[in-house]
Amino acid sequence: MAVDMELDGGGDGKGKAPPQISLSGLFLACMVAGGVQYGWALQLSLLTPYVQTLGIPHALTSVMWLCGPIAGLIVQPCVGLYSDKCTSSLGRRRPFILTGCIIICISVIVIGFSSDIGYALGDTTEDCKVYRGPRYHAAAAFILGFWLLDFSNNTVQGPARALMADLSGRHGPSAANAIFCSWMALGNILGYSSGSTNDWHKWFPFLMTRACCEACANLKAAFLVAVVFLGLSTAVTMVFAREVALDPVAAAKRNEGEASGLLAVFKGMKNLPVGMPSVLIVTGLTWLSWFPFILFDTDWMGREIYHGRPDGSPAEVTAFQEGVRQGAFGLLLNSIVLGISSFLIEPMCRRLGARAVWVMSSAVVCVAMAAVSVLSAWSLGDFGGSVQDAARAPAEEGGVRASALALFVFLGLPFAVLCSVPFAVTAQLAASRGGGQGLCTGVLNISIVVPQMAIALGAGPWDELFGEGNIPAFAMASVFAAAAAAAGVVLLPKVSVRSVSMAGGH
């Protein structure tokens, strides 16, 4: 059943209210989201295709992504809980943001130099221009960096969102989430621009080695730029996010007798705000519909649309890499629409209600995922529907490729809803009971990562049953999107117009 609610503002309830911050100050305080998202964009657009060049088969690439859900399941709720109680002089959120960003920098350097690490450990003595075999040491280094990156991303993301809710004040959580979403869009634009650029190796030729040819050097350079941008954005956030530290004595008294660690997280889940369980259910279904595309979008462009293979002939590899770059360009267009749309979400919620906006976005995703499946079948239709057959045939399908890019653009608005509305509703629900922004954000993340675990475990084997393509996963995503829309109509709380714009503190 839907729950009608009138939610008013309220701080976190765990100490002095933060000083009032201007909208421009709030914008600068959120800059770390852009830095983190830059690296995340590179991870999404390039790493699934790249790891296949190291010898990991397509069916196992989704399993590699298990690290994100596992990290989200363990790290974000715990970090959210401890950040609610942190008594550091830097404040509650900034210590976790700073630590996570340092680890992100280390992890992306490991990923960028994974081929060189594997070469040093004895993968091969041949030059990368002639060697086409597996490089398992490089793959191991890559996966280590990949997992470390996901754990550190989760360390930053929960406190960063909670920080925005803490500081939002009179601007409200919807405005804070719109700013967060706009920084994500900017990070995506920069990251996907880097991923779609094929000239990094020309600008930084010293990054090419016997183990690292052009594609590898492009990846390496893009991640080194990510380190610089993340360092800058973290510094700006640390300066402008002026938190008020918790009083250690008062915090100790308040925390006496409370459970700690994961026990506290599960204890907190028993006392969620009214309406939060429904939000968790709909969020889970929504992410089941999105994660196949997030995981395989550039791989889909390389395989189904450009008919390439990461482990095929030189011509097939070239076609695959071109498809991946075009997929990154599609994600760039998607991010531009995301950035524009992020400023439309609050007016839409004010006019239609958060529930209606969320439900309509799920309906759009349902149509889009069905269109992806149809477009893929159309692209492969002349080759018997087989990715392997299509990879050996010439591909001159300008209409199909243009339609594929159009789908990336079409998904920009619902992705803006995904990045904003669930978190804004969660912040309002937390404010309605006087605090716990960090814990509620962490618990919401559980409803995101559990579907991701299901997709990560099942998508690769499921697709392999149908010829190693991505069509079955996208078709199933359309079904989940329809279920999310139906569940949203029945279950989501009806948040008042006033609460959308004003909830979140005074």
From Swiss-Prot:
Pfam families for the chain: MFS_2
Regions of this protein lying in the Cytoplasmic compartment: 1-20, 76-94, 157-171, 242-275, 349-355, 426-441, 492-506
Tissue: Widely expressed. Highest expression in sink leaves and lowest in germinating seeds.
Species this chain originates from: Oryza sativa subsp. japonica (Rice)
GO cellular component: membrane; plasma membrane
Pathway: Glycan biosynthesis; sucrose metabolism
Extracellular compartment spans: 42-54, 116-135, 193-220, 297-327, 377-404, 463-470
Cellular localisation: Cell membrane
Annotated family: Belongs to the glycoside-pentoside-hexuronide (GPH) cation symporter transporter (TC 2.A.2.4) family.
Record's keyword annotation contains Transmembrane helix: yes
Name of the featured protein: Sucrose transport protein SUT3
Role: Responsible for the transport of sucrose into the cell, with the concomitant uptake of protons (symport system). May also transport other glucosides.
Membrane protein topology class: Multi-pass membrane protein
InterPro entries reported for this sequence: MFS_trans_sf
Biological processes, Gene Ontology terms: sucrose metabolic process
GO molecular function terms noted in the UniProt entry: sucrose:proton symporter activity
Keywords: Cell membrane, Membrane, Sugar transport, Symport, Transmembrane, Transmembrane helix, Transport
